[in-house]
Amino acid sequence: MAINDKEQKSHSKKIIIAVIITVFTLWYGFDLNQYASLEQIKTLQQTSGDYIAEHRSLAMLIFFVSYVVITGFSLPGAVLLTLLGGGLFGFGYGLLLISFASSIGATLAFLVSRYLLRDYVQKKFGARLDAINKGVEKEGDFYLFSLRLIPVFPFFLINILMGLTKISTRSFYLVSQVGMLAGTAVYVWAGTKLSEINSLSGIASPSLLSALALLGIFPWVAKRGLALFSQRKRYSRWTKPKSFDRNMIVIGAGAGGLVSAYIAAAVKSKVTLVEKHRMGGDCLNTGCVPSKALIRSAHAVAEIGRSNEFGVDAEIKTINFEKVMGRIQQVIKTIEPHDSIARYSAMGVECLTAEAKIIDPWRVQIDEQVLTTKNIVVATGARPIVPPIPGLTDVPYLTSDTLWQLTEQPARLLVLGGGPIGCEIAQSFARLGSTVTQVEMASQLLGREDADAVAVVQAELLADGVNILLGNKVASFVSEDGQYSAVLANGDSVVFDQVFLALGRQANIRGFGLEALDVAITERGLIEINDYQQTSIPNIYAVGDVSGPYQLTHVAAHQAWFAAVNALFGSVKKFATDYRVIPAVTYTYPELARVGISENEAQQAQLDYQVTKYDIDDLDRAITDSETKGFVKVITAGNSDKILGVTIVASHAGELLAEYTLAMKYKLGLNKVLGTIHPYPTMSEANKYVAGNWKRNNSPEKLLAWVAKFHRYMRKA
């Protein structure tokens, strides 16, 4: 039977570990460590002179291989060998030999560490290592170069630890080769005077170590200097004002813009908020608020439809679509004051309804006036993607911007896209009575979520009458004699009255001056930002959908705090935006909510994790409400109770998720959730019960066996 890759790798690891143990056993068993002393290498230098004179090439080869073996196995004595190399072969040849031998030996140790340990460490500490690996990807070469320049950091430890990161082998070798050169040269030069050296402390004097430490810091100083030079050069195109009219100008009054302006005003800075359309942005006017109002109306219809389950005979006579849409507008109007000019003006924000254009990093034209500002926050949001599908302009299509203007319900609605918006709209219109067809090119709806959670949602969409076509896409649209149809890639066609496009959103990055400033844009068409929400022009910040990485209202508000604080106080202290705990909810029935990683993501990251599940159909409150569909699934790290991620699919899953978001934010494990009193009967008890399942799965079996013996004894007493 063939050995699979996993078994073969395990076998190889055992062989390598056996070799390492053998080498260390021989080294210490035969007391070879006694030769790793200054006196011994002095003796060796004196006794090997004649041999080297006669067999110089062979002696150099033996020395080279010995150095590689000792450094590769992280055995003690590398410093002494470096001195010996200088004493035996002189500065030039000694430096040449040791420079390459030390780099090759270090790389061998690096590779052994990576092969033996990285998988285990990644599984055990994957979530923590993500941030380190991202830092290594950005500046790993600089980190390693600095560490190599400073001999204070143990040579062998650097090799082992860097093997656990994602730095490439090529980079590790090349940076080590260059970075260790200065320190190696010092010790090789000292080795040429080996007979005069009485202790290693004389070589590694405080002044020398300080000099090398300064040399190690030099790359960072140089990098900072280059960054400042580049920044100065970037700003050189414009003239900076001597004083400013505003501390901050915010462009866009969606969630990100409103929070940025609010924080700026709260700390008594002078801030102007510019919005050319409506306060509240997409979320209030065309996104979160109207869609949830629509979902509520659709849910009311569904509740009446199943009223006989509760012993109530009721029927729906008519669905007044115009009233449904009217209620949505009334909901928007009721919430509008929360985001109004009056409210924000009372907070100290100057609110202007106008078009803004960034003239330079410190000047913004707002209609006819030009204001100077210390900082700018771009919060211009995003708009629905309208793809260039042949024939699309010949048919009546809707987006999340235009859907809310409907006064007549489409009898046949075609929904393109299987993401959260597509699923929410498809289910809502199906419940309201439309014949709905949903097309998704992927093999699964809600592609970022686990298949078991999506299956629950998809089953409900199908039960509500949504015709779901997966693994397909529209090739073209046809308009003929007032009839509209979509021709699919597989040749089928779908007849419709309206088509709703839910194919994602693209950032609003044009039309307000960014192009002229050459602000960096990512491949995804987002404004490129750093960890502090700064764009490529440091005093211009970006938040929300225009910069990503998440297009969620609450993330835009979250980013806004960091942008505002960094803009106003960044000269004193800057804060990196924290994305570790980001909750998200899809408001279908049942809702699908998640925070942290999914099970699929844990598998892809090869983490050491556990999955614990609790089915909602076992929950008393769910049974009383006849809301038994779904489950709570928790991903924990290894055998610990540390929560890595939670997926909930259930009625009101978004409300249930808040407990886990808080727990993850403040590093509270499942034991804390289990130890918290949850009121009975509530849906929130599901969180306690899944924690109980985890506890049972991780109970100390050996201890419980002794406890059972104790109780048997007590019954006899």
Cite the ranges covered by each PLM segment.
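N-terminal Rossmann-like FAD-binding beta1-loop-alpha1 element of flavoenzymes
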Residues: R246-L273, G422-R431
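Flexible, glycine-rich terminal cap/loop adjacent to redox cofactors
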Residues: I251-A253, A265-H277, V289, A293-A300, ...
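Glycine-rich dinucleotide-binding loop and its adjacent helix/turn
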Residues: C288, T380-T435, V439, D464-I468, ...
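A Rossmann-like FAD-binding core segment of flavoenzymes
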Residues: A314-E315, E350-T353, K357-Q365, L371, ...
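A conserved FAD-binding loop/helix module that cradles the flavin
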Residues: E449-V456, I537, V543-E601, Y680-K702
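Membrane-interfacial helix-loop-helix
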Residues: I3-E7, T25-F63, S99, S103-N159, ...
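Glycine-rich flavin
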Residues: I263-S269, V274-Q409, A442-L446, D452-A453, ...
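FAD-site-proximal beta/loop scaffold in flavoenzymes
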Residues: T393-P410, S493-K573, A658-E659, L674
